Regions:
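Active-site PLP attachment segment
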Residues: 229-272, 276
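Conserved PLP-binding catalytic core of the aspartate aminotransferase-like
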Residues: 310-366
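Conserved core of the PLP fold type I
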Residues: 52, 57, 62-204, 218-219, ...
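N-terminal "arm"/small-domain region of PLP-dependent enzymes with the aminotransferase-like
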Residues: 2-72, 79-82, 283, 289, ...
Length: 398
């Protein structure tokens, strides 16, 4: 008998599996609104000018490709800290933030989860309902029980504030609470600053450990604006975790450029925490890759390239906002049987469209338009060339 005779076929990843189905579809004119990737107006992945300039300089320097330190490139880690906490952050001045380069946002989450399992082995993890599909899998793989807290209100297309606060308060003390710092995935519905303050009050009262996930900084309202929750928590006195990613904001998806940041109580404590996080990394992938983080570090630490990148990020953010507004206008003009005005109020790359699983299936079968079964669509995949096709198809399946 084979060692693998009892191995069962794993279910397809709901997002990446959708991409596989899309690639296998031979119909011309098919449209993929499922994958979480920013496409430009021409329907292509952009190669940012700031990234091209940084890569050109790196190639011309003929830099050696030795092993990086376990925690990654120092200039990269410092650039991440300033982007998240602000260049004038007291926490940074006091040495109270530990940042390590990670293999994408996913690697940052898993490293943080593995470290937390050593600190709080009996803790419960809570994620929003709904949340990014991999949040549950990552924390369950680290050995934690995972449950949901209420977040999205389908009736209002907004936040279920009362349910959110009630569920956070009902969690066992010292639970680990995963929060989307901005551009909530999959709903596009974010907390207001007043909401954040109320959430913070509950977390402090219950002794919960916040784990902020920020994969879309700059895609909501701006780089500093989208870091507002992180900076609010930085003033709270709490210890907390932040996972961050540059896949979207630098269009470096395949380079897996992320970071884990941990807020401590002192410089001395930071040293001990860093030593333990490095042990986790060493037993997972030893040390991170060089190229993507080198590019990001060069851009963040060069005033000229930083300004160029911020302009390009602003263009991407503006195009998504334009597509949201155009989608709402097109659906209304085509006589859609419901009001989609809420789509224009959402933030980031995604929209919780309100489409049912059956309607999403019809979009795929009848029109070759792929979306996630929950009704999540990637607004960043829309453009002036496919918007009319998409909105007409949505109108027909309602």
């Amino acid at each position: 008998m084979s060692l693998f005779s009892a191995v069962e076929m794993a279910p397809r990843d709901p997002i990446l599996g959708l991409n596989e189905a899309f690639n296998a579809d031979t119909r011309p004119g098919k449209i993929n609104l499922g994958v979480g990737v920013y496409y430009n107006e021409e329907g292509r992945l952009p190669l940012l000018r700031a990234v091209q300039a940084a890569e050109k300089a790196r190639i011309e320097a003929h830099a050696p490709r030795g092993y990086l330190p376990i925690e990654g490139i120092a200039a990269y880690d410092q650039g991440v800290q300033k982007l998240l906490f602000g260049a004038d952050s007291e926490l940074l001045a006091e040495g109270r933030v530990v940042t390590t380069q990670a293999v994408g946002g996913t690697g940052a989450l898993k490293t943080g989860a593995d470290f937390l399992k050593r600190l709080l082995p009996n803790a419960t993890v809570a994620i929003s309902d709904p949340s990014w599909e991999n949040h549950r899998a990552l924390f369950e793989a680290a050995g934690f029980p995972v449950q949901n807290y209420r977040y999205y209100d389908a009736a209002t297309h907004g936040v279920n504030r009362a349910g959110l606060l009630e569920d956070l308060n009902a969690l066992p003390s010292q639970s680990i609470v995963v929060l989307h710092a901005c551009c909530h995935n999959p709903t596009g519905v974010d907390l207001s600053m007043d909401d954040w303050r109320q959430v913070l009050d509950v977390l402090k009262a219950k002794g919960h450990v916040p784990f902020l996930d920020i994969a879309y900084q700059g895609f909501g309202d701006g780089i500093d604006e989208d870091a507002a929750a992180v900076r609010l928590f930085a003033k709270s006195g709490l210890n907390f975790f932040v996972s961050s990613s540059f896949s979207k904001s630098f269009s470096l998806y395949g380079e897996r450029v992320g970071a884990l940041s941990v807020v401590t109580n002192s410089r001395e404590e930071s040293g001990r925490v860093l030593s333990q996080v490095k042990r986790v990394i060493r037993t997972n992938y030893s040390n991170p890759p060089t190229h993507g983080a080198s590019v990001v570090a060069s851009v963040l630490n060069s005033p000229e390239l930083r300004a160029m990148w911020e302009d390009e990020l602003g263009e991407m953010r503006g195009r998504i906002r334009t597509m949201r507004e155009a989608m709402v206008a097109q659906l209304a003009a085509q006589g859609a049987k419901r009001d989609f005005g809420f789509v224009a109020q959402q933030r980031g790359m995604f929209s919780y469209s309100g489409l049912t699983a059956e309607q999403v299936e019809r979009l795929k079968d009848e029109f070759g338009i792929y979306a996630v079964g929950t009704g999540r669509i990637c607004v960043a995949a829309l453009n002036n060339g496919n918007l009319d096709t998409v909105t007409r198809a949505i109108t027909q399946v309602l």
